[in-house]
Regions:
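Short alpha-helical segments enriched in small residues
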Residues: 1-179
Length: 179
């Protein structure tokens, strides 16, 4: 199954990400706009998660993105709140403001209103800040608002799981090469 394998038995993606973070002795902070706290909720459902999950910011308004996460006004004016640039700034801001190793963010148009030609309804930008760099993944979903929000959280968790496993594998290769 390779990287598509998550775990044996009954487990959540948040629990898998938590275990990966604990194995690395790393911490995570999140920033959420359109998901309104669902990503943080997924982590707080994992017993003992506070050992790796530090907390998050629900930043539905641009003012909160600026004030609490340090997203520049100029970035919001140039790219908008639903953009790859904003997602990365949110992830970085959450990690920096909460002193976490990793930051994960979600911003998008969950519907039924909003959207534009560049970012139609269902567009979700997931920001990822790590010790080795920053990235953004963009996904698009159809369906109702609650479905889009749930799928966005699932996508963010799965992407982070894959990124951490790739990082661990690369660290292993680097360590093995110096042995």
């Amino acid at each position: 199954l390779g990287e598509d394998f998550v775990c044996f038995g009954d487990c959540s993606l948040a629990a898998v990400v938590y275990r990966e973070l604990r194995a690395l002795d790393r911490t995570l902070a999140v920033a959420e706009s359109c998901t309104g706290g669902l990503l943080g909720d997924a982590f707080t459902n994992v017993p003992g998660a506070s050992k790796a999950f530090l907390g998050g910011v629900i930043c539905y308004s641009n003012d909160v993105k600026v004030a609490l996460l340090g997203v520049p006004d100029s970035l919001l004016e140039q790219h908008g709140a639903v953009s790859a640039e904003c997602a990365i700034a949110m992830a970085t801001g959450s990690a920096e403001r909460l002193s976490a190793d990793y930051g994960l963010s979600i911003t998008g148009f969950a519907g039924p209103e909003g959207g534009n030609k560049d970012n139609p309804l269902g567009t979700i930008h997931i920001g990822y800040h790590s010790p080795v760099g920053v990235w953004c993944k963009t996904v698009r979903y159809t369906g109702g608002r609650l479905d889009v929000k749930a799928r966005a959280v699932h996508a963010a968790l799965d992407w982070m799981r894959r990124k951490i496993r790739k990082y661990k594998f690369e660290e292993f290769l680097n360590y093995s090469a110096t042995d």
